[in-house]
A protein has these predicted regions:
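Extended helical coiled-coil dimerization/tether regions that scaffold
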Residues: 185-333, 360
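Acidic, Mg2+-coordinating catalytic modules of nucleic-acid enzymes
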Residues: 418-436, 440-668
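Glycine-rich phosphate-binding loops of NTPases
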Residues: 18-43, 56-219, 409, 508-550
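Hydrophobic positions in the central parallel beta-sheet of the AAA+
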Residues: 181, 331-333, 435
Length: 668
């Protein structure tokens, strides 16, 4: 994204190469040996479409973009397209080059023709070398309503006309609207004084050049003169003996050279070379005796201050501009998280916004665009400003990207989601897939279940999986966000069987096999599979436990995993039953393990129990473990290394499904 802004607003065509075209359109260039004018016009283009909101008092600046229906609004919407497109003479020039290539080949001796590689072999070969002369910048007026189409890019038909009569006039108009500054990801900062990297002191000295005033400071000029006189007096004394001898030297063409030394000091150079940044390491008033050079404070903090100084400089230069100042000042900050610890990353956006706000007046507003791979950077941000770039694949396997506008997230509870994601550091936005679990036990043990089975779950082990503990009653609240982001998602939840006791007025927890039992889990009732009766849930096949997310360009799947009936033996008898919760399934599917470790867990099994009695004992124990469910999970975690247990079947099934989904996406 930053590359596109730099390309279209700095207009350095040399920055663009053939590889900036999406690989999905390369076939339209490769193998093309003949090209007509009509075919050239259909060649791929690189576009940047912009939608601007303009206050009424600034409408005169965007008259070229406005239509009559905007005149009744206080804020007008205008749109324009910046395009890198084939020149009108591309086909002609390419065919001339091809003709010359064929002619050159024919002129080769017959023995060498087979080895001779004429240029260009095809259109791809031609553009590899001539892209910057074969393509040009174009500018169009767009219909702003075209931006309202959800999930759709602006089509060629959305352009309502050329922006100006000439490219030069169009560029001048665009420059009068938008000025873009870049804070690059590679900031060349270093703690090593001998390195070629920058430090804050060098940056501060550069800042002096930007902030230089045309007014003469007479007091500073007088001080500089006095300094020159003192320095000259010192230098004359030091060189007096040497120059006295040199002045007596005579030779061919040399007569009494009369050398002298004088002090010449440049105010700018003197200030620049004497500007060094120090940090005070002790609290209290400024004390030169308690300061250290900047290299002792760490690259993270230096990077942080560097970006703030850059933003401040950029705003000052834009606000101090003469003539027609661009209406919009956009500062694009690329991956600010470099070298910064998580806490500083979390504070960065808030501090940067406050820093910009201090510089602003009623008419000078700098806007920030921040690209990041860090969940900490968006820690203190609402949904509205977030644009989520989801990597996906076209049907032919071409890598692509879909941009989702989180301000359009359709949910009745955005405040809950925002607060929850803030607590979990927003890792969901940077994940390859998401697993939603009910409680502490699953959150503690699930990573262990994945890591100890890399052969069966290679994609899960190597991918970035966001594990969110959402609680049984809250998983459903994540449905809009999971669908919106389009990530493969696995919801691991519980059957939570309940039944009405005799003479009761309220359903209570019961064994899964209780007649007439239903689930109290709203995820199963309102999301997937959309059923309430326990017996129906247990009979649901795998296909009924997944749902296709149909939002966005590339749909993804969501699957639910809950307890299923499994066969176990106890007291010489075989039984077929399902646990009500994760903990019940863990114990019922690891009975042999419990024989050896029951005492450590705090639940020793009686060999004389019938299978039905055993299920009831497990149910009663899990309802109220002696030291709580979290402690039970930690005990299971601690014992695993010396005595591994088996992952419950329903979780194995769900993890295998998610691994296959990630494997399928990797193949695409």
């Amino acid at each position: 994204m930053t590359h596109v802004f730099r390309f279209f607003f700095e207009r350095r065509k040399s920055d663009f190469t053939f590889y900036d075209f999406n690989s999905g359109c390369w076939d339209q260039f490769q193998g093309v040996k003949e090209l007509g004018q009509g075919e050239a016009e259909k060649l791929p283009k690189i576009r940047l479409d912009l939608l601007l909101e303009v206050d009424r008092q600034d409408w005169y600046r965007v008259v070229e973009l406005m239509s009559f229906h905007d005149l009744s609004e206080d804020i007008g919407r205008v749109a324009l397209r910046l395009e890198f497109a084939p020149r009108q003479d591309l086909a002609e020039r390419f065919m001339v080059a091809r003709k010359n290539a064929r002619k050159a080949r024919e002129q080769q001796p017959e023995k060498e023709r087979a080895l001779f590689a004429p240029w260009p072999e095809d259109l791809r070969d031609y553009l590899d070398r001539e892209l910057n002369s074969a393509y040009e910048f174009r500018y169009h007026v767009l219909d702003p309503d075209s931006f309202d189409r959800e999930g759709s890019v602006c089509a060629g038909s959305d352009a309502t006309g050329r922006l100006a009569d000439s490219s030069a006039a169009a560029r001048e108009f665009v420059d009068s609207l938008i000025h873009v500054d870049m804070v690059d990801a590679q900031r060349f900062l270093s703690d090593d004084e001998t390195s070629k990297g920058r430090d804050l002191s060098r940056h501060v000295r550069r800042f002096l050049d930007y902030s230089a005033s045309e007014d003469i400071d007479h007091a500073a000029h007088q001080a500089l003169k006095a300094s020159e006189q003192q320095a000259e007096s010192y230098l004359v004394g030091k060189f007096a003996t040497t120059f006295a001898r040199l002045n007596k030297v005579a030779g061919p063409g040399i007569r009494n050279p009369r050398l002298s030394v004088r002090s010449r000091q440049s105010g700018d150079a003197l200030l620049a070379e004497s500007a060094w940044v120090y940090y005070q390491f002790a609290p209290g008033e400024e004390d030169a005796q308690r300061q250290l050079p900047e290299r002792f404070n760490g690259l993270g903090y230096k990077n942080f201050l560097f970006m703030l100084i850059e933003i401040h400089e950029m705003h000052r230069r834009w606000a101090a501009g003469v003539g027609v100042r661009p209406l919009i000042h956009l500062v694009v900050i690329e991956e600010p998280e470099a070298h910064m610890h998580p806490q500083l990353q979390q504070a960065f956006l808030k501090i940067a916004r406050e820093f910009v706000d201090e510089d602003e007046s009623e008419v000078f507003h700098t806007q920030l665009v921040v690209t990041t791979h860090s969940p900490h950077i968006i820690y203190d941000t609402s949904f509205d400003p977030i644009r989520y770039f989801r990597r996906l694949s076209e049907p032919d396997g071409t890598p692509a990207c879909e941009v989702r506008d989180l301000s359009k997230l359709d949910t009745d509870d955005p405040r809950f989601l925002r607060r929850f994601l803030k607590l979990t550091n927003c890792h969901l936005f940077f994940a390859d897939a998401v697993i939603l679990v009910e409680g502490d036990a699953e959150r503690v043990l699930l990573p262990l279940m994945i890591d100890t089975d890399p052969g069966r779950l290679p994609q899960l082990v190597s991918s970035h999986i966001s594990l969110l503990e959402v609680g049984g009653s809250h998983a459903l609240r994540f449905k809009p966000l999971v669908r919106f982001l389009g990530l493969p998602a696995l919801v691991i939840t519980d059957l939570d069987s309940v039944a009405m006791p005799k003479g009761g007025t309220r359903r209570k927890a019961c064994l899964v096999d209780t007649a007439g039992a239903v689930t109290s889990n709203q995820t199963l009732i309102q999301w997937i599979p959309g059923k309430k009766d326990i017996e129906e849930l247990l009979k649901t096949q795998r296909e009924g436990k997944q749902d296709k997310n149909r939002e966005g360009v590339s749909p993804s799947w969501v699957r639910v995993s809950y307890q299923t009936r499994q066969t176990f033996s106890w007291g010489g008898k075989t039984h077929h039953s399902a646990g009500r919760t994760f903990e019940e399934s863990m114990l019922l599917e690891n009975l042999e393990w419990m024989r050896e470790n029951g005492k450590k867990v705090g639940f020793e099994l009686d060999e004389g129990l019938s299978p039905e009695q055993l299920v009831q004992e497990v149910f009663d124990f899990v309802r109220n473990p002696p030291e709580g469910k979290t402690n039970l999970a930690l005990t299971l975690f601690d014992l695993f290394e010396e005595s591994p247990w088996e992952t419950p079947h329903y979780i194995q099934e769900g993890l295998s499904w998610l691994n296959n989904e990630l494997d399928r996406e990797a193949d695409l």
